[in-house]
Curated annotation (Swiss-Prot):
It comes from the Eukaryota. Residues 1-17, 340-355, 403-412 have a biased composition (Polar residues). This is Uncharacterized protein C12G12.07c. It comes from Schizosaccharomyces pombe (strain 972 / ATCC 24843). Residues 1-20, 223-243, 310-412 are annotated as: Disordered. One of its GO terms (cellular component) is cytosol. Residues 361-379 have a biased composition (Gly residues). Residues 390-402 have a biased composition (Low complexity).
């Protein structure tokens, strides 16, 4: 019982702020009284020192003050003791107050958590009911039942849910609570729809029964003839069953090697071959370009068209010979396969022996650019000396071994 009394006192102190203010006033008054009596005590101690040295020097008031020493000390001690008790009581009350606040906070926290769990569970149930109803409504739209009023009620409830208003929230709450109220503009109650939704999700096919149905479906498929494409077996809406296994609808991607039966071989293109991988492939010679040098130093091109094109290209290159290339001197021959050069030829050893492709727009004097010649002096083309080099099948115009190139006299 004393503990209950202490709890009541702590609750009273906590709930009544006036007592806290009154306690502060009392403590302030006691502190002031203790300070005054402490001064009186110090004054009496000084008078005692004076009386000990010279007792005749004290007057009547001082002697009366010395006579009231005991009363002053007694009152001072009582005030100090009272103040200490008040301080202890205040400390105890503050401790009880903190404990009481902690207890109240814990209770309040538990209540809030309980309310949160309750609200969360309620909201989760409503969301679950809504999702399950949407799944059932989609299935019922594709595979309607034989009950026309029920189908109409499901569609109307679905329209109400899609509105997203307070009416929709109330409809979802009634569906979650399995209310006996009727769906607006229908004769079916929320309880009936909720029970049908529960039955829709409460009866999945067992695994053994599902395997038997799969085996039956494969057994009922007709045999396909050899070479005929595989046809997908369609299932009507009346034969659709609620199952988690995939239906025999969709696209099957098969490699050609995975399809059984005979296959008609496509004719090979001219540049292709249909020889098996384990045999030797014989490539026709007319489809291959042979890059082999012949005895005369020219490349061999099997096809006639390529030879004609090469000759035309060589003629175009020879027609663009620059001015500083001069004809060979017939008097000088070839020594050991190397043409002899005239000693008077200036810079002939530095001249390239291969014609450079120059365009008709690069005419003029020196340098590069529009209407300018190639490297060296003078870019004017000498078109009258087209027979300077022999035409060969080689793509690079090399001088003929029989040509006499001794007189390469550059034009000043």
């Amino acid at each position: 019982m004393p503990s209950q009394g202490n709890n009541k006192n702590s609750e009273n102190i906590t709930q009544n702020p006036i007592e806290g203010e009154l306690g502060s006033v009392i403590v302030e008054h006691l502190t002031k009284r203790i300070r005054n009596f402490t001064k009186k005590k110090q004054k009496i101690l000084k008078l005692e020192e004076i009386a000990a040295s010279d007792s005749n020097s004290l007057n009547d008031d001082q002697r009366k003050a010395l006579q009231g020493k005991d009363a002053v000390l007694t009152t001072l001690n009582e005030l100090k003791e009272l103040l200490s008790q008040i301080d202890a009581t205040r400390i105890r009350d503050e401790k009880h107050k903190r404990q009481f606040e902690a207890t109240e906070n814990a209770k309040r926290k538990e209540e809030i958590e309980a309310q949160y769990r309750e609200g969360y569970d309620t909201a989760q149930k409503q969301v679950s009911s809504l999702v399950r109803f949407l799944r059932f409504a989609s299935h019922n739209c594709v595979h309607p039942s034989d009950d026309a009023p029920f189908n109409s009620a499901v569609e109307k409830l679905l329209v109400i849910v899609y509105e997203g208003t307070e009416k929709s929230e109330k409809a979802v709450a009634d569906l979650n609570d399995s209310s006996t109220d009727v769906v607006p503009e229908s004769e079916v109650s929320f309880q009936t729809i909720s029970s049908r939704v529960d039955n829709f999700f409460a009866a999945p096919l067992p695994s053994e029964q599902a395997e038997e149905l799969i085996e039956d479906d494969y057994a009922e498929q007709p045999e396909q003839a050899v070479g005929q494409p595989i046809e997908q077996q369609s299932i009507s809406d009346d034969e659709a069953r609620q199952t988690n296994r995939p239906l025999n609808r969709g696209i099957q991607f098969l490699n050609e090697s995975e399809i059984e039966g005979q296959h008609v071989e496509e004719p090979a293109l001219p540049s292709e071959t249909s020889v098996p991988a384990n045999s030797t492939l014989q490539v026709p010679t007319e489809n291959v370009e042979v890059d082999v040098l012949g005895k005369d130093g020219t490349n061999i091109y099997p096809t006639q068209n390529q030879v004609v094109e090469q000759k035309q290209m060589q003629q175009k290159l020879d027609s663009m010979s620059p001015e500083w290339y001069q004809a060979a001197d017939p008097s000088n021959g070839v020594v050991d396969g190397t043409p002899k050069l005239n000693s008077n030829t200036r810079g002939s050893s530095k001249r390239p022996s291969v014609n450079r492709s120059q365009g008709s727009g690069q005419r003029g004097r020196g340098g590069r650019g529009f209407y300018r010649g190639g490297r060296g002096r003078g870019g004017f083309f000498n078109r009258s000396k087209r027979g300077q080099y022999s035409n060969s099948n080689n793509s690079t115009s090399q001088p003929s071994p029989n040509a006499e190139l001794s007189n390469f006299n550059p034009v000043a």
